[in-house]
Curated annotation (Swiss-Prot):
Family: Belongs to the universal ribosomal protein uS3 family.
UniProt key word Ribonucleoprotein: yes
HAMAP family assigned: Ribosomal_uS3_B (MF_01309_B)
PANTHER family, A to Z: 30S/40S RIBOSOMAL PROTEIN S3, SMALL RIBOSOMAL SUBUNIT PROTEIN US3C
GO biological process, alphabetically ordered: translation
GO CC terms of this entry: cytosolic small ribosomal subunit
Top-level taxon of the source organism: Bacteria
Function: Binds the lower part of the 30S subunit head. Binds mRNA in the 70S ribosome, positioning it for translation.
Keyword vocabulary terms for this entry: Ribonucleoprotein, Ribosomal protein, RNA-binding, rRNA-binding
Name assigned to this protein: Small ribosomal subunit protein uS3
InterPro entries: KH_dom, KH_dom-like_a/b, KH_dom_type_2, KH_sf_prok-type, Ribosomal_S3_C_sf, Ribosomal_uS3_bac-typ, Ribosomal_uS3_C, Ribosomal_uS3_CS
């Protein structure tokens, strides 16, 4: 089942945590969930060029806190913080609550699965050869500390008559191992021949302690190399 299931969902509560972190009163859950979907769709569309990795939504008492993980925080903040203030006001109108907006920089976008998938999708739209795009992404990730990476591209690759799936892997990607810190991301490339799908799995090592926040803390700190205290590396 580890081959089929979303690797982030499989590890929730083990070494990953949820991207929406709030509790709802009876009857409010559906409304707040729909609100979260609208917030994510709005920010993803509004900040296409900002290389957004993920959006975390928290709801303290009658407030809303949105944290955007981005490889290009300067695009979101704008000149003297003007753009981020406009975004905050729009989000406050959408949620009807006092909304705060935080930006977290992704220090190593080359090992972030979502950003890798977005990059490959953009290259496919620019008619870059899919094998070259995949190989370049794999080499960059391995050079910057990933222990393994797998990339799947599917669709009418290269304008072929029949859709197919091509994949490229380097290193280890142990999908069944729950303690493995595996990042997963997807993207769509809208090409002249139709939509091509991109899936990326990045293995960043093993998290030995039981801590649902461990993976996020490591990503924020840029500690993708890991340390001997919380990660076990396999000997070659």
């Amino acid at each position: 089942m580890g081959q089929k299931i979303n690797p982030i969902g499989l590890r929730l509560g083990v070494n990953r945590t949820w991207d929406s972190r709030w509790y709802a009163n009876t009857g409010e859950y559906g409304k707040l969930l729909h609100e979260d979907v609208k917030i994510r769709e709005f920010l993803t569309e509004e900040l296409k060029q900002a290389a957004i990795s993920k959006i975390v939504i928290e709801r303290p008492h009658k407030k809303c806190r949105v944290t955007i993980h981005s490889a290009r925080p300067g695009i979101i903040i704008g000149k003297k913080g003007a753009d981020i203030e406009k975004l905050r006001k729009k989000l406050s109108e959408m949620t009807n609550a006092d909304t705060s907006l935080n930006i977290v920089e992704v220090r190593k976008p080359e090992v972030d699965a979502t950003l890798i998938a977005q990059s490959i999708a953009q290259q496919l739209e620019r008619r870059v050869a899919f094998r070259r795009a995949m190989k370049r992404a794999v080499q960059s990730a391995m050079r910057l500390g990933a222990e393994g990476i797998r990339i799947n591209c599917s669709g009418r690759l290269g304008g072929a008559e029949i859709a197919r799936m091509e994949w490229y892997r380097e290193g280890r990607v142990p999908l069944h191992t729950l303690r493995a810190d595996i990042d997963y991301g997807t993207a769509e490339a809208k090409t002249a021949y139709g939509i091509c799908g991109v899936k990326v799995w990045v293995f960043k090592g093993e998290i030995l302690e039981h801590d649902p926040m461990a993976s996020e803390r490591r990503a924020v700190e840029g500690d993708n190399q890991g340390s001997s205290s919380n990660r076990r590396r396999e000997n070659a």
